[in-house]
Amino acid sequence: MTEIVDITAREILDSRGNPTVEVDVILEDGAMGRAAVPSGASTGAHEAVEKRDGDKARYLGKGVRQAVDAVNGEIYDALSGSDAEDQRRIDRMLIELDGTPNKSRLGANAILGVSLATAKAAASSSALPLYKYVGGVSARILPVPMMNIINGGAHADNPIDIQEFMILPTGAETFSEALRMGAEIFHALKKQLKDAGHNTNVGDEGGFAPNIGSAEEALAFIVKAGEGAGYRCGEDFHLGLDVASTEFFKNGKYVMEGEGKTVDPAGMVEYLAGLVSKFPIVTIEDGCAEDDFDGWKILTERLGGKVQLVGDDLFVTNPERLAVGIEKGLANSILVKVNQIGTLSETLDAVDMAHRNSYTAVMSHRSGETEDSTIADLSVATNCGQIKTGSLARSDRTAKYNQLLRIEEELGDQAIYAGRRALRAL
């Protein structure tokens, strides 16, 4: 009854107005799963490759008809009749069918759409929500949201070098309370920025993109906004950064144009250590560039004992890259983006490897998102305790938060909000 009888892909739009792939998988018993694939703005060189058409006369070359055709043709032919409940076999077949190390022939966007839609169809057939289907009875930890409320870098048109400034409502008792805290701080920040003469337009991930030049000024605005909303920074909520430093790593130096600094890896670490000494920052993502292993080693030795150091471009959700990082002692956490690796099974393997080696894991969106809320379920299914899915504006971001509210409600007394326990710094 869980045999795949139909697979249909289509081209839809993501939150940036760019095409992406959506896939429907239908089973013999009529159950259906649907998944839409996200896309990143700042992408790691080692990510699985999303397939774009390259036809400049159509969607400026960003169309995904080739990926759609691959799903509706070659992938459908290979998977038709397969058991949707055997996720690992499905994913293995997809990987072997593609035949490349980075999924570039069929496209990670084609492969991931099918992988996730298959899992959702199997969950529907089992009459289970996705988080329970994937995670089983132990899936009951609601994640701490990392809310990106000031945007810079590749996510905004302002001079701020650091890509994301985040709040983490660590002091909340429940996820719903954490979401309320975040929303109240978000609105307090909007008022303070407006009062200071800054624009309050939002960036790709729903955060504000004010025309300020320094990280310290951005962090000070957030601390003040939290106080204005009635919350204590360092007690009720903490701060986080996504430096996205690969974006400004040039010829062995970190060129921070907004800050007016050019530093070597050791200097970059000292710059971040200075911010940590001044503000209650508990998590830093991509503090060094993806292939700057020496910088990562210095950073981990300097701050790894008191700050969560998250590898995004460093690990690209790839168990092989993560294994290298673990061996070399780089970072202490992995950012998990399903489209960086391209299948559900490989995503789960990355989280499992992280947990077995005492690394934390953070489930994450991309800057180009859709209304698909799969990652909300996966954050609970994997008990990773943290989710990064943008600010408190734009429905492509709030869709994930709202799904987590539903999951918390469904779990009832069994629900556990991760809170401070999710972070090694606390």
From Swiss-Prot:
Active-site residues per Swiss-Prot or TrEMBL entry: E205 (proton donor), K337 (proton acceptor)
Binding site residues for Mg(2+): D242, E285, D312
Pathway it works in: Carbohydrate degradation; glycolysis; pyruvate from D-glyceraldehyde 3-phosphate: step 4/5
Alphabetized UniProt keyword annotations: Cytoplasm, Glycolysis, Lyase, Magnesium, Metal-binding, Secreted
InterPro entries in the cross-refs: Enolase (IPR000941), Enolase-like_C_sf (IPR036849), Enolase-like_N (IPR029017), Enolase_C (IPR020810), Enolase_CS (IPR020809), Enolase_N (IPR020811)
Origin: domain of life: Bacteria
Needed co-factor(s): Mg(2+)
Residues annotated to bind (2R)-2-phosphoglycerate: Q163, K337, R366, S367, K388
Chief subcellular location: cytoplasm
GO biological process assignments: glycolytic process
Cofactor: record remark: Binds a second Mg(2+) ion via substrate during catalysis.
Reactions the enzyme catalyzes: (2R)-2-phosphoglycerate = phosphoenolpyruvate + H2O
Keyword S-adenosyl-L-methionine appears in the UniProt entry: no
Disulfide-linked positions: none
GO CC terms in record: cell surface; extracellular region; phosphopyruvate hydratase complex
Keyword flag Magnesium: yes
SMART domains linked to this entry: Enolase_C (SM01192), Enolase_N (SM01193)
SUPFAM superfamilies attached to this UniProt entry: Enolase C-terminal domain-like, Enolase N-terminal domain-like
E.C. number(s) listed in UniProt: 4.2.1.11
GO molecular function: magnesium ion binding; phosphopyruvate hydratase activity
Location in the cell: Cytoplasm; Secreted; Cell surface
Annotated family: Belongs to the enolase family.
Function comment: Catalyzes the reversible conversion of 2-phosphoglycerate (2-PG) into phosphoenolpyruvate (PEP). It is essential for the degradation of carbohydrates via glycolysis.
Cited PANTHER family: ENOLASE
Name this protein carries in UniProt: Enolase
Taxonomic lineage from the root: Bacteria, Pseudomonadati, Pseudomonadota, Alphaproteobacteria, Caulobacterales
Gene name per UniProt: eno
